[in-house]
C-alpha cells in the first residue's frame, strides 16, 4: 500500500497541473508504478536517475548496466525500453501525418528519436516533394562505431524512384559529440553536387549526438 500511496502524489500533481509539471523523478515513478522491497517507487526512480545520470542515459542503457541497480529486473527494463520505442514510433507517425514539416525543431526532434542510442553510425535521408512535404524516410547506410560509407548515387536512385524533389540528410555520432567531422563536410558537398545534376535540392544535413545536434543549414554550410 505504501508504494501505491507514494505514486498517488505525482499522479495527482499531473492531473492538477499537467504532465509537464512533473519532475523527471516523478515521471519515471509513474511508469515504474511500484518500488522494490524496502524502497518506495519515488526513491527507486531517484536512485535510477542518479545512477544513469539522466533519462537519456537510462533509456539508452543495456540490460547489463540496468541490472546493476539493486532490485531492478527484466520486467522494469522491458517497461523502459518500451517507453523509448513508443517515443520513437510517435515521432515516426507525427512526421508522416504533419507534413509539410512544421519547423526545424520538429525535424531535429524526429531525427533525435530515430538515431539516438544507435551503437553504429546510421545515415538516414528524409525525402520530400516539391512542396517540402514528407514522402518517406529511409536508413540507407549503416556503418561502424565511427564511420559510415555513403554512396550519393544510391541516394539519387532512391529519390528518383519516389519522385522526390528535396532531401534532408542525417546521421548519428555514437560517441555522443554532434560536431561534424571533416569527412562529414566532404560527403555532404559530394551529395549536393551530385544532386544538382538531377535537380534535387539538399535542404540540410543534421548530425545527431547524445542530447545534441548540429544543422549544416544553421551553420551556413548549405
Swiss-Prot record:
> SUPFAM superfamilies recorded for this chain?
RuvA domain 2-like (SSF47781)
- Which UniProt keywords are given for this protein, alphabetically ordered? Hydrolase, Metal-binding, Metalloprotease, Protease, Zinc
Q: Do you know which InterPro entries this protein is assigned to?
A: MPN, RadC_JAB, RuvA_2-like, UPF0758, UPF0758_CS, UPF0758_N, UPF0758_YicR
From the record, which residues define motif JAMM motif? 171-184
Q: What would be an example GO MF term here?
A: metal ion binding
Q: Which GO terms describe its biological process?
A: proteolysis
CDD domains xrefs: MPN_DUF2466 (cd08071)
- Which superkingdom does the taxonomy of this entry point to? Bacteria
Keyword Hydrolase appears in the UniProt entry = yes
Q: Where does Zn(2+) bind?
A: 171, 173, 184
Which Pfam families does this chain map to?
RadC (PF04002), UPF0758_N (PF20582)
MPN domain sequence ranges: 100-222
What the entry lists under PANTHER family is as follows: DNA REPAIR PROTEIN RADC, UPF0758 PROTEIN YEES-RELATED
What family is it from? Belongs to the UPF0758 family. YicR subfamily.
Q: What is this protein called?
A: UPF0758 protein YicR
Amino acid at each position: 500500500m505504501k508504494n501505491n500511496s507514494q505514486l498517488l502524489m505525482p499522479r495527482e500533481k499531473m492531473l492538477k497541473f499537467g504532465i509537464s509539471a512533473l519532475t523527471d523523478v516523478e515521471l519515471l515513478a509513474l511508469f515504474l508504478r511500484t518500488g522494490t522491497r524496502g524502497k518506495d517507487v519515488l526513491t527507486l526512480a531517484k536512485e535510477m536517475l542518479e545512477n544513469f545520470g539522466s533519462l537519456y542515459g537510462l533509456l539508452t542503457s543495456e540490460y547489463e548496466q540496468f541490472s546493476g541497480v539493486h532490485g531492478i529486473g527484466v520486467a522494469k527494463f522491458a517497461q523502459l525500453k518500451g517507453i523509448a520505442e513508443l517515443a520513437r514510433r510517435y515521432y515516426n507517425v507525427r512526421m508522416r501525418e504533419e507534413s509539410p514539416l512544421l519547423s526545424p525543431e520538429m525535424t531535429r526532434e524526429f531525427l533525435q528519436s530515430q538515431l539516438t542510442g544507435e551503437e553504429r553510425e546510421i545515415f538516414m535521408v528524409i525525402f520530400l516533394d516539391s512542396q517540402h512535404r514528407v514522402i518517406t524516410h529511409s536508413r540507407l547506410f549503416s556503418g561502424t562505431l565511427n564511420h559510415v560509407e555513403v554512396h550519393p548515387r544510391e541516394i539519387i536512385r532512391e529519390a528518383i524512384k519516389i519522385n522526390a524533389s528535396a532531401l534532408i540528410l542525417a546521421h548519428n555520432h555514437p560517441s555522443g559529440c554532434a560536431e561534424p567531422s571533416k569527412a562529414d563536410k566532404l560527403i555532404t558537398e559530394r551529395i549536393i553536387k551530385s544532386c544538382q545534376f538531377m535537380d534535387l535540392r539538399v535542404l540540410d544535413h543534421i548530425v545527431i549526438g547524445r542530447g545534441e545536434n548540429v544543422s549544416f543549414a544553421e551553420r551556413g554550410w548549405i
